[in-house]
Amino acid sequence: MINIKENEDLSRLNHSCAHLLAQAVKHLYPNAKFWVGPVIEDGFYYDIDLGDEVIKEEDLPKIEKEMKKIAKDGKRIVRHELTKKEALEMFHDDPYKIDLISRMDEKEQVISCYTQGDFTDLCRGPHVDTVKELKYFKLIKVSGAYWKADSNNKMLQRIYGVCFRNEEDLNDYIKELEDRKARDHRKIGKDLDIFMNHDLVGKGMPLWLPNGSIVRKELENYIYHKEQKLGYSHVYTPCVGTVDLYKTSGHWDHYKENMFPSMKVDDEEFVLRPMNCPHHMLIYGNTIHSYRELPIKIGEFATDFRYEASGAVKGLERVRCMCRNDAHLFVRPDQIKQEFKEVVSLILDVYKDFGLKNYTFRLSLRDPEDKHKYFDDDEMWNNAENELREVLNEIGVPYHEAIGEAAFYGPKLDVEVKPAVGPEVTLSTCQLDFLLPRRFNLSYIDNNGEKKVPVVLHRAIFGTFDRFTAFILEETKGALPLWLSPVQINIIPVNNEYHLEYATNLLNKLRDKEFRVELDSRDEKMGYKIREAQTKKIPYTLVLGNNERDNNTITYRKYGEESTTTMSTEEFITMIEEQIKEYK
């Protein structure tokens, strides 16, 4: 979608349409008072206090009708400039405008407002010349929003809308908006029983339902086998640690605002972990290592907790409790290039399997003109940065350098993926760390018998299973590939009296092959059952009648297709096995 906020003409148009919305609301709800109505990437919104009245989605057409009536009158939009005193007098009975005016800088000599017909609002502008220009608009939705985004304040009603110069652009936007809604992983997650949330558990704490658990377990198995082939050793560690652990790692001093509050138990103070690296440092440090043992690769599917503002959490995409596909590689300096290349190759391998093509690599490097901001080892930095560049150039992946955006302790690689809708998201990361091994006094014995400090590569291929699941649900609109689908095959007997026995025998045979199969023997019409299987986006629906029973065959219909295919049971089993093996 076009970024309306960054388009000067569309920004002005949508800003004016926000005022048109407010004017229409004022006509229909005379007691309405208004907070702010800014332009955003997707259009505009206005926050409104209606007292005890509530605007619902079904009220939006009525408001649109009033907006069109006002626009047809063609009143000019006129700017007025006031002193602060004059502005306070003009809006004396509006507590929201009084609040805005009162907080304006005393040095601001001129306060502007705009008038269109019988409506005047405080605003910096700019606006279009007349309301007649506001022809092609649509109110999208209504939601709640706390005044000043503070949950201690009153809840206002927020109406979203969008405006374009012509009908074609508006219709294109609405189509894309419908596609975005259809791809929203929160809707898909609910429709397909992937996950849920509950206030008693808490915001940002998703509950994975049986179908979602299957998806997550398949993702875990998939990446586990890939990591195992590359020599990773997986561990389990507690999801809490002492405050002293995070003081040692530095997280307590530099990351505390993103952590949950600590809790005292007996004479110890614990905290939910925000990340797993401190635990993995201790595992590495548990034994003495020779240079010959390196690299040592420690992986974990670890539950972490990070504080997110309640207004920021979103389905599985942004959560407070997450499971990371985490690993830490302990390497010698001369192994950095080799291991970094292996990580990048693994990322590309995974993306190929999932059909991801629209992505770019972001290499965050230090600013050589501002060296005091970074860990003090010029040779280590120069060698590492050059080797990372060499790897990306050798593999031939698209990347850009972000100078000055490296962490204090080392350069970092982020993979930014463009989803089907919405802005780019970061899925995979690989961070070099020169400092953390020193904080934990980690070492290995080199070929001269001397202690040396290893370098650590923090890497996450999926990022978190939560965000990756959200991403894949939106990419596929919930039509997951066969190997990842919670239910792979749905069996429907035409008539239970004559075909249920054959269907049940087939069910057992397919389950013996470890396929995920359901049998729909409900007393419902055949067409209804088939449509429901399509709604659930089950890859294969088998319909079994006389012909199938008598000839030991099956007739299947693939999700999204109208045609059917008949084949022997053994042929079908072989076909399914081959499709699943492509990802194993």
Pin down the residues of each PLM region.
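NTP/phosphate- and nucleic-acid-binding module
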Residues: 1-35, 39-41, 47-584
